[in-house]
């Protein structure tokens, strides 16, 4: 009997370890009462005003916060392809100029979705989608485009960044109403590949976070901005859980598709 119990415990430990290692996309919360929880913000971060990140938008599916996004110019927003995969443009809007995803600011309809032609839903490679807006934006101190890197512009490991959004905080005590941000350093590409697997982390991906965890993007932040020195270097994409030790957040690297963004949007 004791041998059977020992075998069962060994199998259980292996299953749990395997589950923790499986990367999960920062899938949006389609319904406000998702079984994943009702929180909507960055883990381990701090509240900010949208004027601190005026390029930030809330991408909304049938009037509910789904993902983040970044203003590129008066007609285009960049988000993650896994946020728009399988959806029609008429079901989407963006809210801009508000620190709250559910009120205030300006709401604009999405006219067209352009996902990257190489987007792979199975490994989340090329996780980029451009959204053409129905009407032009009016810029102000709370609505501004973000600067973009040049094609293939490198980002040094250890570069401090800011990631923002309304994704899950994993905390029952924090309000889900206000925009949050966290400062996280970029991680060496090889270190990130060792954390996950060499096949999981492609050249279109960029990692950021602390070895000890504690600060990260999470569900509901997908598609949102990772900015360094005023430039949009990443799009919130996926990770193993949220803010887990040893597993940095994974972002879609913007510099790799700079020419594609320019070709589609003119930016």
Swiss-Prot record:
Disulfide-linked positions: 67-83, 192-207, 218-242
Location of the active site: 82, 127, 222
GO biological process, one term: digestion
Short name of one Pfam family: Trypsin
Site (Required for specificity) residue list: 216
SMART domains attached to this UniProt entry: Tryp_SPc (SM00020)
Listed InterPro entries: Peptidase_S1, Peptidase_S1_PA, Peptidase_S1_PA_chymotrypsin, Peptidase_S1A, Trypsin_dom, TRYPSIN_HIS, TRYPSIN_SER
Signal peptide residue numbers: 1-18
Molecular function (Gene Ontology), one example: serine-type endopeptidase activity
Expressing tissues: Expressed in the midgut. Expression levels drop a few hours after blood feeding and pick up again 28 hours later.
Propeptide feature ranges: 19-41
Annotated keywords: Digestion, Disulfide bond, Hydrolase, Protease, Secreted, Serine protease, Signal, Zymogen
Enzyme Commission code: 3.4.21.4
Catalyzed reactions per annotation: Preferential cleavage: Arg-|-Xaa, Lys-|-Xaa
Subcellular location: Secreted
Enzyme class: hydrolase
Record domain Peptidase S1: where: 42-266
GO CC aspect terms: extracellular region
Family per record: Belongs to the peptidase S1 family.
Purpose: Constitutive trypsin that is expressed 2 days after emergence, coinciding with host seeking behavior of the female.
Full protein name: Trypsin-7
